[in-house]
């Protein structure tokens, strides 16, 4: 709720759950926290790799994130603004780090992070969860990527 308020206070629109029982956005947001990534385009791209290689999930549940109406609208706006070339530049800049996540970091984990995690995890220390799952987050240097600037950018 704090992040949602932050977005609203700064003229941004928070995503809304598909229905009142859904925890999809909470689960996605928690994955940013557990893997130590912000919400920039570059770090969203890195998070995709963590999710695919370092998480346990049902593909249909994970894929339902792309069906959120606000995300579809955001994707259209982004494509219109930066174009396909901008997306290629984005992925070109993150590929080395994505490979490190896929072939080094995620393989060293003790067990996969459950994307749809139990509610009780929200009451635990992040450092304890990272230790339990063997999650080693990227260093600031590893996350220092060339950023795509667009109107939806915001500092985190």
Predicted features, each with a name:
Residues 1-121:
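Core of folded catalytic or high-affinity ligand/protein-binding domains
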């Amino acid at each position: 709720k704090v992040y949602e308020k932050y977005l609203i206070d700064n003229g941004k629109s928070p995503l809304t759950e598909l229905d009142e029982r859904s925890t999809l956005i909470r689960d996605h947001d928690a994955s940013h926290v557990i893997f130590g990534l912000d919400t920039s385009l570059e770090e969203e791209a890195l998070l995709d790799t963590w999710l695919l290689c370092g998480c346990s999930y049902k593909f249909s549940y994970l894929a339902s994130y792309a069906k959120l109406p606000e995300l579809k609208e955001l994707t259209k706006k982004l494509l219109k603004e930066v174009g396909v070339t901008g997306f290629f530049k984005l992925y070109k800049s993150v590929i080395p780090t994505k490979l490190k996540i896929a072939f080094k970091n995620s393989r060293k984990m003790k067990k996969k992070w459950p994307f749809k995690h139990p509610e009780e995890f929200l009451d635990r220390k992040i450092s304890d969860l990272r230790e339990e799952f063997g999650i080693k987050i990227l260093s600031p240097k590893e996350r220092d990527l060339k950023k795509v600037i667009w109107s939806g950018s915001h500092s985190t």
